[in-house]
Amino acid sequence: MRTKKAFLLLTFNVLIYLAACQETERILANNGTEDNEITTSKGVSPNTNPLFLSNSTAGLYDSKGRIRLTIGHIGAIGALRNDVKILEVSHKALQAEGILDDDLDVEIISQTGCGESYEGVAVAADMYHLQKVKAFIGPYCNAEMDAVARMAAFWNIPIIGYMAASNNLADKNAYPTLARISLRTTNSIAEATCAMLRHYGWNKVAIITNTGILAYDRVLSFEEVFHQRGINVVKKIMFDEFADSKAMIASGLLNDIKNSARIVVCLFSNTRESSREFLTAANTQGMNVNEYGYVFPWLQDGGKDASPWTGADGSMLQKVKDQYANAIIIDDVNSFDNTIVGPFIERIKDVGLTEADVDIANIYGYLYLFDALKLYAIAARKVLNETGKAENLLNGRMMWQNMRKLKFVGMVGASGIASGQVSMDDRAERAPLYRGFFVSPNSDSVLPMVHMEPTMLDNCDGIANKSGCYEIVVTDIMRDFWPSVDRKMPKDEPDCGYRNERCDYTLIIIGAALILLFIVAAVSAFFAQKILEKRALDKLPFRIYRDDLQFIDEEQLKSMLSLGSTRTKMSNMNYGSRNHAIVGTNTHAIYHKYVQRRPIVFNRADKTLIQLMKAAVHDNINPFLGMVWNEREEMLLVWKFCSRGTLQDIIYNESIQLDTKFHGAFIRDILAGLEYLHASQIGYHGSLTPWSCLIDRNWMIKLTDYGIADPLERWEKSQSISRDGLTSDDDKSQATQATSILYESPEMLKNREKNRVRRVDQDWMRQTQTRRQLGDVYAFGLVMYEIIFRALPFPEGTNQSELVEWLRDGSKVVKPTIPQNKVLNMDLSALIQDCWNTTPEMRPSLRRIKLNVETYLNIKGSLVDQMTRMMEQYANNLEKLVAERTGMLEEANQRADRLLSQLLPAYVANELKLGRPVPPKTFTSSTVLFSDIVGFTEMCQNASPLEVVAVLNGIFDGFDQFIARKDAYKVETIGDAYMVVSGVPEENGHRHINEIASIALDVHKFLSEFIVPHKRDTKVQCRLGFHTGPVAAAVVGLNAPRYCLFGDTVNMASRMESNSEPGKTQISETAKNLLLKEYPDYICEQRGEIPIKGKGLCMTYWLMGTKSEGSGRSGAYLAPSMKSAGTGFTGMLGNSANDYSLNLKNPTGLQR
């Protein structure tokens, strides 16, 4: 309604404008006449009325008299960049082809319209009246094309549409001068759609659309064509214009499609977005199945959008494409490829344009614009050539008549592109050229399915019958492509109707009921059989339920093996991590675990065999306790536990010495077990190996794994069980099983290979019981050789893995042999080789083997007696070893005690050894002595580090020797400093002052005789000082503990030493008083008061010596007087033969 109102208002304004312009022209013309006559007329004929005449021939010729036609191009705001350049390309092409030349040429005036205010209509009026255009190309949009086409018809000038696609514009009674060059008009794509529907026999369709004027016009166009061609629209469903998939589902309208149609034609305003939402809804409702066909005439206004499953960056959106699976899209033949882009870019290079200068997404707009100008020029040349009158070029109807059924090559037609060939129909509309594309779910690109091309009809008037006078011929490109069972296209209506009302299902119901009854009966019988079998299996004596097993972990097993006093270390050898469990209350068992993949089915022979295994009782047969199966996807074979492991463990344990008695006892026990099995209903062992021979606590061999070999192999072949569950510690592991092939006789290997290649449904090839027993003899020969020589009977250096592979694939024949370097009784050697005979019948019987073995191995007595003697010898050796190790321990303890007593006081060391703490202790009276070597720094500078260390070792070793003879304790040495205490850690009354004083005198005497090795002319002097008083003592530190002294007495003693003089001993007044009081034999000389740090002025004394030494005793030491005291090393030179010298080879010791 808005468009019609605007058109009427604009037309009224234009008519007023035209009348005013015509009146002005008439007055001006009359004023210019010679007699100034004004002519009037009471009536105006259609040929002279300005409302029915084209503008005059003025402006038709240029100044040189050549025809120049002015064409007005009305584009769109914001669409088709550089569209004027495209017209320029077309103009150049027309000149190059000779259609336009000097006598006929065109001038193009280009302006834009298609805005919100219908600017294009005003532009058309302006072009016609003021710029004197003779034809129009455009406008771009439908609304303005409707108005301008009517005005052009009114003015009788040709107008060519190149983008407007409305079906209304095909009415030539309303638009008699309008030709359209666009390939994608609504009426043409409707014709193509109708042709494809009829091609597949789809005469009943539903139309899906949405609200809005554009969708409404499209539906009207399609309904009109469908009605003309006999296509029945059974249902028309309309969604809201902007409805999404959820809203479509919520509306419930999709159910109407299910109940009324199977072929759906989708016509939306926004084809790209709305179609995607609709298919999403259809998929959600389960309507995207093979019996539905969705047809999408790809109608778009303006430029061509990318496919719905193409993202903004050009990538494919797979989920969106999956929604379009099995959809059919009708579009231009080059819609889904870029074949037209290359030729188009080549054509626009003539005017300096590149791909970046145009809107490639709207490439069809450029092509149609080029073709529109060419259509007009060809028609103009045709009119001019046929009539020879230039004024006929202004006759719009005549020009339109010459555009009908016109064919020419379009912009890209020269490149062989089908859509580049222009063919006009009988209404001057471009004949449709389309394809149907199938969106395959199995291909990344769409697949062309049909080609639709028009064929013009003869003797047809398109104006009279309102058609283009052509018939669309549909050609199959693909056949049998629909993803249904029969590969055929779906039908437009189900065979049985939408509600199955056309089919009689009585017979089908009866048949289905019978089949269902049969299935129920079969299933019931199957489950009844399973229940009966389960009850029968539940009653089998060898069945053990998994809940009846108490599994034992490694820690529990160690605890159990340590309980019995009769068990030895050999009792639990190699059994610390195997599979152990308790069956019932207290039966210790081991189990082999197999992964169960399918339920195990026992046949009668299996049940009989396993029951016989369960009932087997013999001293040399290990009891079979039972099986666990069909529980937790695993099968367990449970055997009684033997505490000393397997025969293999004993054979290859080098710490165990085996003599001929062991050999004979083991071989005798194995033979006894085999004799019992061969005489029983079990009949054979079947898998005799060293690890299937267990040893109990009494060193008796017990055979295990007997009889079960055949069922295990058959169950593994049928994939009921797998050995993947066997751990590496299990003696039935895959590695062990691989090695077991060495113990199988050649005929057994051949039989196994035959069974391996047989199908599961074929019968299992069994060996006779006799052959099985002879196979045991072959394995016994290998085990007997292994017992005697603790090795396999193959040459040394043979790779066991390669040997196993050779035997498995049969690529190389390897026979066991006795190496020449093995010493063995000739008769026994011949017996073993007879057991290995490749001809089973040539092997000896068990009775013959038993007689020969007893003779050759001289088996007497029991193995228990041999073990008793061996244990006695072992106990004697153990007592001797314990005595030796005890002596070594005592010696190590003594060395540790001596070292500890040197590091700590004996009392403290004893307390620490006993683990008792040593608390700090205060001593009320003790004497602390400090000494320091004079000039030690200078000595270090003038000597090497090793020489300095040698001097210190010599001095301090001498100090240590005579301190050791005193009741004193060396606290520590720090560099050249030496600290001694007496009265600590053991109190000794007042005797400590005498001990320290005598030590001080001995030190001076020792140094007076000491010779520096590397400087024999140098004498060593030291300063000494001591003080008497209370101290505190404690052990400090957990790592490397030290016995330390604390208190003011220690500090005062240190001050006495630091303020002393070389070669002298300074003592405090307290020490002098106690010394002279208790021991008056000592001589002390007053030094006087000197400043002491932290004490002020203190009276100190020199210790000069003893009276007994001063009376002339040989070697007596007397301190020099203060006047003659020296301060260096040179004051005291000793030339006596008793001088001490340092032994550099033993720097810690002194030699005289």
From Swiss-Prot:
GO biological process: cGMP biosynthetic process; detection of temperature stimulus; intracellular signal transduction; microvillus organization; receptor guanylyl cyclase signaling pathway; thermosensory behavior; thermotaxis
Enzyme nomenclature, EC number: 4.6.1.2
Membrane-spanning intervals of the chain: 507-527
The UniProt record lists the keyword Magnesium: yes
InterPro entries in the cross-refs: A/G_cyclase (IPR001054), ANF_lig-bd_rcpt (IPR001828), Cyclic_nucleotide_synthase (IPR050401), Kinase-like_dom_sf (IPR011009), Nucleotide_cyclase (IPR029787), Peripla_BP_I (IPR028082), Prot_kinase_dom (IPR000719), Ser-Thr/Tyr_kinase_cat_dom (IPR001245)
Enzyme class: lyase
Pfam families: ANF_receptor (PF01094), Guanylate_cyc (PF00211), PK_Tyr_Ser-Thr (PF07714)
Organism: Caenorhabditis elegans
Job of this protein: Guanylate cyclase involved in the production of the second messenger cGMP. Regulates thermotaxis responses in AFD sensory neurons. May regulate AFD neuronal activity such as calcium responses to temperature gradients. Maintains the microvilli receptive ending morphology of the AFD thermosensory neurons by regulating cGMP levels downstream of kcc-3. cGMP levels antagonize the actin cytoskeleton regulator wsp-1.
Primary location recorded for the protein, binned into one broad class: membrane
Cellular component aspect of the GO annotation: cilium; microvillus membrane; neuron projection terminus; plasma membrane
Effect of C141S: Reduced basal guanylate cyclase activity and reduced chloride sensitivity
Annotated glycosylation sites: N31, N55, N385, N465
Gene3D superfamilies: 3.40.50.2300, Nucleotide cyclase, Transferase(Phosphotransferase) domain 1
Stretches assigned to the Protein kinase domain: 567-857
Coiled-coil boundaries: 861-899
Entry membrane topology: Single-pass type I membrane protein
Entry protein name: Receptor-type guanylate cyclase gcy-8
An annotated Gene Ontology molecular function: peptide receptor activity
Key words, A-Z: ATP-binding, Cell membrane, Cell projection, cGMP biosynthesis, Coiled coil, Glycoprotein, GTP-binding, Lyase, Magnesium, Membrane, Metal-binding, Nucleotide-binding, Receptor, Signal, Transmembrane, Transmembrane helix
Signal peptide range: 1-21
Extracellular side: 22-506
Family, similarity comment: Belongs to the adenylyl cyclase class-4/guanylyl cyclase family.
Documented activity regulation: Inhibited by chloride with an IC(50) of 60 mM.
